[in-house]
């Protein structure tokens, strides 16, 4: 399920923006965790732009 969420956010970056603005939520994820998820995801994306690739642990 975690990998599905990551795939979805990578394919739909507008959802990440809506999460940041409080315009969307993730089913099954408490609202209080959303800022942490957005922060981590943004850090990973920033790092991936500096690298040739990014690898997710499975």
Curated annotation (Swiss-Prot):
Annotated Pfam families: ComX
Positions bearing Tryptophan derivative: 56
GO BP annotations listed: establishment of competence for transformation; sporulation resulting in formation of a cellular spore
GO molecular function: pheromone activity
InterPro entries the record matches: Competence_ComX_Bacillus
GO CC list: extracellular region
Propeptide: 1-52
Main location: secreted
Keyword Lipoprotein assigned: yes
Key words of the record: Competence, Lipoprotein, Pheromone, Prenylation, Secreted, Sporulation
PTM note: Trp-56 is modified by isoprenylation, which is essential for activity. Modified by the tryptophan prenyltransferase ComQ before export to the extracellular environment. The type of isoprenyl derivative differs among the different pherotypes and depends on ComX primary sequence.
Locations listed in the record: Secreted
Subunit note: Interacts directly with the sensor histidine kinase ComP and stimulates its activity.
Misc: The DNA sequences encoding ComQ, ComX and the N-terminal two-thirds of ComP show a striking polymorphism, which determines the specificity of the quorum-sensing system in the different pherotypes of Bacillus. In ComX, the sole conserved residue is the modified tryptophan essential for the activity.
The protein's role, per its UniProt record: Part of a major quorum-sensing system that regulates the development of genetic competence. Acts through the activation of the two-component regulatory system ComP/ComA composed of a sensor histidine kinase, ComP, and a response regulator, ComA.
Protein name: ComX pheromone
């Amino acid at each position: 399920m975690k990998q599905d969420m990551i795939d979805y956010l990578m394919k739909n970056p507008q959802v990440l923006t809506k999460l940041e603005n409080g315009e969307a939520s993730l089913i099954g994820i408490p609202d209080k965790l959303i800022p942490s998820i957005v922060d981590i995801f943004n850090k990973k994306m920033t790092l991936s732009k500096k690298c040739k690739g990014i690898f997710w642990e499975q």
